[in-house]
C-alpha cells in the first residue's frame, strides 16, 4: 500500500503567512497569524470540546465516528490554516439534495441522480458521503487532505449500514482537492468551506477547465457560502439557488 501524504504544520503555517503577507503586508499577516494561534488555544478549552461533541446523535444512530470532538490537536491546528473540520448537519444536507432533485435549473423532469457522481471536497471523516448514499448516485467520492481523517472515513464507509442506503459505490481518497482530476460524466460537487480563497479559486479554475474540455452538467452545492463570490465571478457557472445556508451553481 502506498504511504499516505503527511502534512507539515510548520510548512503549512509558513505558506499561509506568505500568501497573507503578499496581499496584506508583513505586519497584518503576522497579526492574523497570532490571531489564528490564539483561536486555536481557545478551541482547546473543555467548553469548546463539549461543543464539538454536541452533534453526536448521527454517530450514535449509525455507529460511526464523524463528530469534530475527537479530532486531535494537530489536525485541528492544520484546519485553522485550511478549513476547520465541521461535519454537515443532516437536515441541512437533505434540504440541499431535495432542492437538487426538484431541478432548480428548470428541467421539468428533474435530475436523475443515477447519472451523477457525487464529489465532496474536504470530506473529513465521511459523514456527507454516508448521507449522500441515501440518494441513488452513480458513485460517491470524498477528497480529504488529512490522512488521519481519511483513514477514519474509510472505517466509517466500511461499517456503515442503513436501510435507506441507495448508493453502495463509496470511496474516500486522500489527496489535495486543488489538484485532483474530476471524474467523467455529470457531477454534483459539494463544498462546506473546505479551502481558503486561494485554494477555492484553484478548484474553480480546474473545474472550469474540465467542463470546457468535456462538456456535461455540473452542479455545485456550496454550504455556508462565505466565499460565494469566487463562483459568482465564473463565466462557466451561474447561480440558480440562493438560500440562507447554501447556494447552488450549475454549468452552462
What is the meaning of each model-derived region?
Residues 115-124:
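Conserved class I S-adenosyl-L-methionine
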Residues 198-251:
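C-terminal substrate-binding/active-site "lid" region of AdoMet-derived donor-dependent transferases
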Amino acid at each position: 500500500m502506498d504511504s499516505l501524504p503527511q502534512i507539515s504544520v510548520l510548512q503549512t503555517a509558513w505558506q499561509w503567512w506568505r500568501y497573507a503577507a503578499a496581499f496584506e503586508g508583513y505586519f497584518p499577516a503576522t497579526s492574523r497569524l497570532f490571531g489564528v494561534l490564539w483561536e486555536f488555544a481557545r478551541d482547546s478549552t473543555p467548553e469548546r470540546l463539549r461543543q464539538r461533541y454536541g452533534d453526536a446523535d448521527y454517530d450514535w444512530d449509525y455507529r460511526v465516528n464523524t463528530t469534530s470532538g475527537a479530532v486531535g490537536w494537530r489536525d485541528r491546528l492544520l484546519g485553522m490554516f485550511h478549513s476547520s473540520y465541521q461535519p454537515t448537519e443532516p437536515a441541512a444536507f437533505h434540504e440541499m439534495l431535495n432542492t437538487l432533485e426538484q431541478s432548480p435549473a428548470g428541467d421539468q423532469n428533474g435530475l436523475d441522480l443515477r447519472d451523477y457522481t457525487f464529489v465532496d471536497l474536504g470530506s473529513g471523516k465521511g459523514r456527507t458521503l454516508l448521507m449522500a448514499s441515501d440518494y441513488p448516485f452513480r458513485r460517491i467520492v470524498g477528497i480529504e487532505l488529512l490522512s488521519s481523517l481519511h483513514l477514519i472515513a474509510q472505517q466509517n464507509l466500511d461499517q456503515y449500514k442503513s436501510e435507506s442506503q441507495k448508493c453502495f459505490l463509496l470511496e474516500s481518497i486522500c489527496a489535495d482537492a486543488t489538484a485532483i482530476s474530476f471524474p467523467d460524466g455529470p457531477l454534483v460537487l459539494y463544498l462546506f468551506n473546505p479551502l481558503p480563497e486561494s485554494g477555492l479559486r484553484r478548484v474553480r479554475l480546474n473545474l472550469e477547465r474540465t467542463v470546457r474540455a468535456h462538456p456535461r452538467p455540473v452542479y455545485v452545492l456550496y454550504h455556508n457560502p462565505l466565499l460565494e463570490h469566487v463562483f459568482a465571478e465564473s463565466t462557466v457557472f451561474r447561480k440558480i439557488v440562493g438560500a440562507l445556508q447554501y447556494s447552488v451553481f450549475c454549468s452552462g
